[in-house]
Amino acid sequence: RNKYKQIENIGVVCVIYKLKKGVSKHFWVNINDERFELPGLIEFSNLRKIENDLKIIYLPYYMPITHEKFEKNDEYFFEETFNYLQMLNPNLEKEDVIDFSVNKLKYAQPICDVGFKEKIPPIQTDIEDLYIADTCFYYPEDRGVSESIKLAKTIIEKIVI
């Protein structure tokens, strides 16, 4: 438990839209524009089609959970992000919004500072046959599906063998 407390994480506010219209033809769009407080957007429906040709868009705000913006309400995030979406697709209107949600996660990603490797706790806990799968185990890689699969295989091998 103490080893986990040593690992500092960054939080994320995940804003998700279900829309009638998309904003891009791309799955992943990095944004390097000072008018946007986002690193980018992910339009999942450009990777995999959704029923009725609906569009699913994910907008992440990575920040420390102590940042004042982390405490803002859903309406604040709707207004700000919808403005961003309209900058990308001026034809988008509020009537195109089918659904919208804001989700906040305190432990989105570990902050890998100097000496991080030594902070990583063992996968096996003190409780027999209880293993923990955490993104800190991906180090030195970043979060990703392939890293999740690799960690799952490692744990399965420990359980089965």
Regions found by a protein language model. Give the residues of each.
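Residues at alpha-helix caps and immediate loop-helix transition turns in enzyme cores, especially N-
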Residues: 73, 112-116, 144
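Mid-domain catalytic core of redox enzymes
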Residues: 1-71, 75, 80-92, 122-123
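A short coil-to-beta-strand element that immediately follows conserved catalytic motifs
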Residues: 12, 91-105
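Active-site-proximal substrate-binding core of FAD-dependent oxidoreductases
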Residues: 95, 159-161
